[in-house]
Curated annotation (Swiss-Prot):
Any matching Pfam family: Gb3_synth
Lipid bilayer topology: Single-pass type II membrane protein
Glycan attachment points: 100
Protein EC: 2.4.1.-
Annotated family: Belongs to the glycosyltransferase 32 family.
Lineage of producing organism: Eukaryota, Metazoa, Chordata, Craniata, Vertebrata
GO terms of biological process kind: epithelial cell proliferation; glycoprotein biosynthetic process; negative regulation of epithelial cell proliferation; protein O-linked glycosylation
Record remark on domains: The conserved DXD motif is involved in enzyme activity.
GO cellular component: Golgi membrane
Keywords, comma-separated and alphabetical: Glycoprotein, Glycosyltransferase, Golgi apparatus, Membrane, Signal-anchor, Transferase, Transmembrane, Transmembrane helix
Motif (DXD motif): 168-170
Name used for this protein in its record: Alpha-1,4-N-acetylglucosaminyltransferase
Family matches, as PANTHER family: ALPHA-1,4-N-ACETYLGLUCOSAMINYLTRANSFERASE, LACTOSYLCERAMIDE 4-ALPHA-GALACTOSYLTRANSFERASE ALPHA- 1,4-GALACTOSYLTRANSFERASE
InterPro entries, per the entry: A1-4-GlycosylTfrase_dom, Glycosyltransf_32, GlycoTrfase_DXD_sugar-bd_CS, Nucleotide-diphossugar_trans
Organism: Mus musculus
Amino acid sequence: MLKEIYLSLSLVLVFACGLLYQLTMRSQCFFACLPPFSFPQGLDGLLRSGRSIMFIETSERVEPPPMVSCAVESAAKIYPEQPIIFFMKGLRDSVQLTSNTSYPAFSLLSAINNVFFVPLDMERLFKDTPLFSWYTKVNSSTEKHWLHVSSDAARLAIIWKYGGIYMDTDVISLQPIPEENFLAAQGSRHSSNGVFGFLPHHPFLWACMENFVEHYDSTIWGNQGPQLMTRMLRVWCRLKDFHGLGDLKCLNISFLHPQRFYPIPYPQWKRYYQVWDKEPSFNESYALHLWNYMNKEGKTVVRGSKTLVENLYQKHCPKTYRVLIQGAEGTVSKKPGTGSR
């Protein structure tokens, strides 16, 4: 009897220690810790779920600015049952980040249960894809737009390998995207690469990676990004004009209406930083691309300004607004993320 009591107490102690360890690691872990029961295969199982929302940072920056934080938080809010994975080149096994005031955005995102930070190892990522030979030969130090070009390449490889949805880090999610294989239209005959989604190993993305290498010219802005998606879509499909708000379908790829992600086109990007008499509902949109790369003036989200962008932050990324806008008096990094177009 006494032996059984000791055994029971030992099991309880082991369980309690394990729970305490998980809680401790959750508050201090460098990568947001993997849920042990949902993804028994660890990181590989997480990635290969095929349902993840992916973000990428190809610079060495590890503390997301407010707009990036808002993009990630809003995605986690809209897709609570799906992993939100943020690939960061600046993450290393040797780097030690802790949850403290030096990294407020990293801390608040790490505390969200379905957000995970993952190191971006591009050589490993590109292995077994058409991009590997290009990556091992290219001289990144001579590339004018390397951060953006490498981001264009990485997003193709990630979604081809693992499936899921890629989003730029200046995209605020509003409602779930119901499509599996899709591209986002900026116009009737022009695709973006700021938001797209595919099932794993989709042949369209393999063809995109081949074209990326065959027609590589990083001196032309967008040649490896939206222009690549557009020219490949034209090979696969006979593009037609949109009629009304309906999406287009080509083979098993949906070409989504510009209203889905770009209700405010890039020439009018400043409207996000203006006060509207009547705020738009964006009922036809799945997410909003804020065109942060166009923001050369360094416009910021200002607390109490009642601008459209402030209202979007308050509604769709309230933690980011509270910690990084209210807590920092509206200061926003003037440097766009490498996942911003």
